[in-house]
Amino acid sequence: MVTLEEALKFSKEEIINLKKELNQKAKEQKHLGAYVEQFLDKDLSESGDGVPVAIKDNISVKDWELTCASKILQGYVAPYDASVITNLRKNNLSPFGRCNMDEFAMGSTSATSFYGKTLNPHDNTKVPGGSSGGSAAAVASGLAIASLGSDTGGSVRQPAAFCGCVGFKPSYGRVSRYGLAAYSSSLDQIGVLTQNVKDAAILYDVIAGYDEKDSTSANIAFEPTAPKLNANKKLKIAVIKNYIDQTNDDVKQALLKTIDMLKANGYEIVYKDLMDSTFDVAAYYIIAAAEASANLSRYDGVRYGRRSEKCDNLSQMYINSRSEGFGEEVKRRILLGTFVLSSGYYDAYYIKAQKARRFIKQKYEEILNDCDLIFMPVAPSVAFGFNDVKTPIQMYLEDVFTISVNLAGLGGISVPVGKNENGLNISAQLICKAYDEQTLLDGALSLEEIIKNK
């Protein structure tokens, strides 16, 4: 499959031929569910002249439907481009294809979509991860050369790990959220899914930087990372031992072998522990659900999106539009968020979760003040079956090693390091200080090359 770096050197005619090839592949592999239905019927001329990049269905593209894979937004057409889309168009790239996702980015399986589930391209009985499962499946199966997703608690890194591609979440505020449908405003971050680390750096350089349209955008200097990539830096890496011990045997053995290879290649490895990751899960789901309950209050059937026809008055219209439009997982998180923000429980849950968040960030900072990067798992296991997770709590625990990175606002990247005996991918996660993406990408490139040359 052609890489993003190679495609950026294509002529206009070669780009057109590439788009035709990708469109044909998407139709042939429609069963994967990587793309939502309406994309397959679009005219190729609607995508622009640039190199094609697939876009998750919660990022605004002017004149394209924006549905967040939800029934409640069926028929809604975005009136403007997200800032990341504007940046793509300015750099000889163009949006090409709407990627499937968990409804409103709430999930770890890409099975809660209104359009139906996305399948793992390496084993169709397994989940591709979520919520950016469509983005990961598209890149991993050759239906896209690169893709944009969003990461609120691991939604770029975990599906990248399950599908075997690179998933990179920049530090909070490094990439504009203007035009991203909000789930949890203090945690959401647009990220990239690519075939390799160099492509991730190239695409990141295009979309990163300060944006005055986004009040949470970080107004700090940004320098492109791709031209300065250096795989030869011998970095000091902190391995989170207690997290590696919590993974299953396949993942644990692959990560331990990777650590040995890093040592053999001159990296200084130190071992650290972080607090019990189940505390991260509790804090994350309280904060994320609270913010989601506020953000999703705008979907009321009045201003945009789907309106219920079964109503005799305004109150009934609100209730029926939301009851009919939202899926089960979204309703569950709205109810949880409303509960923890209610007057009797705000101090008991929400305030305590915010204190835990500050503590988590402090612990990461203590380690990163002494080390260049952190090395830890992306997920406790390889991709699992669609029916293996029986309860919402089990699903929430699949994000156990990724959500703390969002709580701390740090950058993280998922890099493939091996496969199990069934051919399912295993990835390692590297984490950097806030806004030190250059070091993160240098380390990831080095890790990628070590794995290729083993």
Curated annotation (Swiss-Prot):
Family matches, as Gene3D superfamilies: Amidase signature (AS) domain
Record key words, sorted: ATP-binding, Ligase, Nucleotide-binding, Protein biosynthesis
Keyword Ligase appears in the UniProt entry: yes
GO molecular function: ATP binding; glutaminyl-tRNA synthase (glutamine-hydrolyzing) activity
One GO cellular component term noted in the UniProt record for this chain: glutamyl-tRNA(Gln) amidotransferase complex
Any GO BP: translation
Domain of life: Bacteria
EC number(s) per entry: 6.3.5.7
Pfam family, one: Amidase
Substrates-to-products reaction catalysed: L-glutamyl-tRNA(Gln) + L-glutamine + ATP + H2O = L-glutaminyl-tRNA(Gln) + L-glutamate + ADP + phosphate + H(+)
Top EC class for this record: ligase
Subunit architecture: Heterotrimer of A, B and C subunits.
Purpose: Allows the formation of correctly charged Gln-tRNA(Gln) through the transamidation of misacylated Glu-tRNA(Gln) in organisms which lack glutaminyl-tRNA synthetase. The reaction takes place in the presence of glutamine and ATP through an activated gamma-phospho-Glu-tRNA(Gln).
Similarity annotation: Belongs to the amidase family. GatA subfamily.
Name of this protein: Glutamyl-tRNA(Gln) amidotransferase subunit A
Source organism per UniProt: Campylobacter lari (strain RM2100 / D67 / ATCC BAA-1060)
Name of encoding gene: gatA
